Amino acid sequence: MEFYSIIKDRRILLGLTQQDLADYSGLSLRIIKSIEAGKGNPSVGTLTKIADILGLEIIMKVKEVNK
């Protein structure tokens, strides 16, 4: 599942509108819509703001390399 689908699904589960998420995060509605549509390239900072509001955690892990 792509990160933008997770954001949208979680927002809906919490009963928030895109405008609510924009207001709480300090981001524009245009940015929220763009992220949820899978467009653009949001920064880690932007994703962190959204994740905090939605109760999500961003985890980075080392990719396994087949030898």
Residue ranges and their predicted role:
Residues 22-25, 51:
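Small-residue (primarily alanine) positions within well-ordered alpha-helices
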Residues 45-60:
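DNA major-groove recognition helix of helix-turn-helix/homeodomain DNA-binding modules
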Residues 64-67:
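Short acidic DE-rich linear segments
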